[in-house]
A protein has these predicted regions:
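Alpha-helix C-cap/termination motif
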Residues: 23-26, 53
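Short glycine-centered, acidic/aromatic-flanked micro-motifs in structured strand/loop junctions
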Residues: 35-37
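Short, hydrophobic/π-rich interface segment
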Residues: 39-60, 71
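Short, surface-exposed connector motifs at secondary-structure boundaries
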Residues: 26-32
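A broad, low-specificity signal marking well-ordered, structured residues that form hydrophobic/aromatic
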Residues: 6, 31, 82
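C-terminal edge-of-domain segments
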Residues: 60-98
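Histone-fold modules and their flanking histone-like tails across chromatin and transcription assemblies
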Residues: 1-24
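A generic structural signal for short, non-catalytic loop/turn and secondary-structure boundary residues
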Residues: 1, 55-57, 77
Length: 98
């Protein structure tokens, strides 16, 4: 099972859209976007831009969770996580006009 992983951070959203498109050009079975904390909204935006502008038939699964991270002075913090799995259907095509 082939998959590509795109880690979402603080870059502009179109950088991640480009990474997703590049990943799909290698014909993986799925592309996974992973993000934590404040980057979660960027991951959702990148997935939606890719789905609405570039692929007409892209399906997604979303998994959310929490990770414990050690912070300053040994304290633990809870950080939200998201994993968005994008799959391209075999009949998926680029929308006309793009």
């Amino acid at each position: 099972m082939s998959e590509e992983v795109v880690y979402v951070g603080s870059k502009p959203i179109l950088a991640y859209v480009t990474a997703i498109m590049t990943s799909f050009s290698r014909n993986p079975e799925k592309v996974i976007l992973r993000a934590r904390g404040r980057a979660i909204s960027s991951a959702v935006d990148a997935a939606e831009v890719t789905r609405t502008r570039f692929f007409s038939d892209l399906t997604s699964e979303i998994s959310i969770g929490t990770e414990e991270m050690k912070g300053e002075e040994g304290r633990t913090r809870n950080v939200s996580t998201i994993e968005i799995t994008l799959r391209k259907s075999p009949e998926a095509k680029k929308p006309s006009g793009s």
